[in-house]
């Protein structure tokens, strides 16, 4: 069964491109274009991992990630952003960071790295 990702980004072009790329990599993908919609999807669906853009109108990704970690601490969250320096506070509760300027495959690789131990634990 494919792992389910929640991808959150207010940049609709990047949202579409990454949705397609992640599906091509074999993941089931839920998408949201803002923090409020993301938290609703997160509360209503099983999610193996969330990818959250940092800068979004209304609610930045750090607050979205913190709320996700509060609701379900075991779900990994990756910040995907053009911001190269994140506050230590943000780094303390997220599971990874990938720059939007990186090749899209960098995000796919980071997701795989984080989920691999979880796959092994489920299989064993």
Task: Pin down the residues of each PLM region.
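Acidic, metal-coordinating helix/loop segments flanking the phosphotransfer/catalytic sites
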Residues: 31-49
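Conserved phosphotransfer cores of two-component systems
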Residues: 43-45, 68-74, 92
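Active-site residues of response regulator receiver
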Residues: 53
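Receiver (REC) domain active-site loop signature in two-component systems and cognate sites
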Residues: 56
């Amino acid at each position: 069964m494919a792992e389910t990702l929640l991808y959150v980004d207010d940049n609709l072009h990047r949202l579409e491109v990454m949705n397609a790329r992640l599906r091509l990599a074999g993941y089931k993908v839920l998408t949201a274009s803002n923090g409020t919609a993301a938290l609703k999807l997160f509360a209503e669906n099983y999610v193996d991992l969330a990818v959250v853009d940092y800068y979004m109108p209304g609610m930045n990704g750090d607050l979205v990630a913190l709320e996700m970690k509060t609701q379900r601490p075991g779900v990994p969250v990756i910040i995907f952003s053009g911001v190269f320096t994140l506050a230590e506070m943000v780094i303390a509760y997220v599971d990874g960071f990938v720059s939007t300027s990186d090749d899209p495959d960098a995000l796919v690789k980071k997701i795989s790295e984080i989920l691999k131990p979880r796959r092994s634990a489920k299989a064993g």
